[in-house]
């Protein structure tokens, strides 16, 4: 832990507080990120049958428990859940194929919109594009990991991961973040989009039409191309 580190805490609560998810506070001068889970959610991690159908939040709690240090555990509930979580396959904590498809589609969809706005002379559009690029780069970064079916563990962990495994992408991201010229920044942004989406088929062709498939399980590049061609035929009246 460094001087600027925060503290992540999992707090187990009774069902009365089941609507709690996260909180923030300060603990001895450090920022504290709080995650809340109910007793039943924690117990479900230890139940093999329930674990198979764990929802996204329970999977997040299980992932946290698998590598954390337990400070207080009345009744041994957390120890049992931790031991169970440590036996879960890595795939249980990884983004799903649906997550990967949604990330690929979103990066492509946003890029199409952003290209259109970049070509506008309207000052409102230009300012809107600047805003979109602010959060768009975050979407590209999180999408990079979702497309590769790697669990998102926060920005700091992402930077460390990229430094070790893909320093070229990290350098490109840093250049894009620092770039002040809008057109130069957009060129770097498109390069990031291409690199992030490469394992899923890359960027859409520079065409005006695309489609989003309902079932990610069938969302192969070929299926996406066929659906896009169908949508295009409707627009053209064929």
Where are these regions (language model features)?
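Short secondary-structure boundary segments
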Residues: 1-3, 9-13, 19, 77-95, ...
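Catalytic metal-binding acidic patch
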Residues: 1-39
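Short aromatic-enriched loop/helix-cap "lid" or pocket-rim segments at secondary-structure transitions
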Residues: 2-3, 46-48, 157-158
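Short secondary-structure boundary micro-motifs
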Residues: 6-10, 19, 54, 128, ...
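Conserved NTP/Mg2+-binding pocket subregion across the NTase superfamily
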Residues: 23, 27-123
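Conserved nucleotidyltransferase catalytic core and NTase-mimicking acidic/glycine-rich helix/loop elements
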Residues: 89-238
């Amino acid at each position: 832990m460094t001087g600027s580190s925060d503290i992540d805490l999992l707090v187990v609560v009774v069902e009365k507080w089941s609507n709690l998810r996260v909180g923030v506070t300060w603990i001895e001068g450090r920022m504290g990120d709080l995650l809340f889970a109910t007793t039943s959610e924690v117990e479900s991690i230890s139940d093999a049958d329930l674990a198979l159908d764990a929802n996204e939040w329970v999977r997040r709690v299980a992932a946290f428990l698998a590598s954390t240090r337990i400070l207080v555990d009345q009744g041994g509930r957390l120890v049992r859940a931790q031991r169970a979580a440590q036996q879960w396959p890595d795939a249980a904590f990884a983004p799903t194929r649906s997550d990967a498809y949604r990330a690929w589609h979103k990066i492509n969809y946003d890029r199409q919109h952003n290209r259109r706005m970049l070509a506008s002379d309207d000052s409102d559009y230009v300012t809107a594009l600047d805003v979109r690029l602010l959060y768009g780069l975050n979407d590209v970064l999180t999408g990079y990991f979702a497309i590769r079916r790697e669990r998102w563990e926060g920005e700091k962990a992402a930077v460390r991961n990229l430094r070790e495994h893909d320093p070229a992408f990290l350098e490109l991201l840093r250049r894009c973040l620092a770039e002040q010229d809008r057109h130069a920044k957009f060129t770097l942004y498109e390069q990031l989009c291409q690199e992030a989406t490469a394992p899923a088929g890359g960027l859409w062709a520079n065409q005006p039409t695309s489609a989003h498939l309902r079932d990610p399980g069938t969302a192969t590049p070929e299926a996406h191309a066929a659906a896009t061609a169908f949508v295009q035929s409707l627009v053209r009246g064929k």
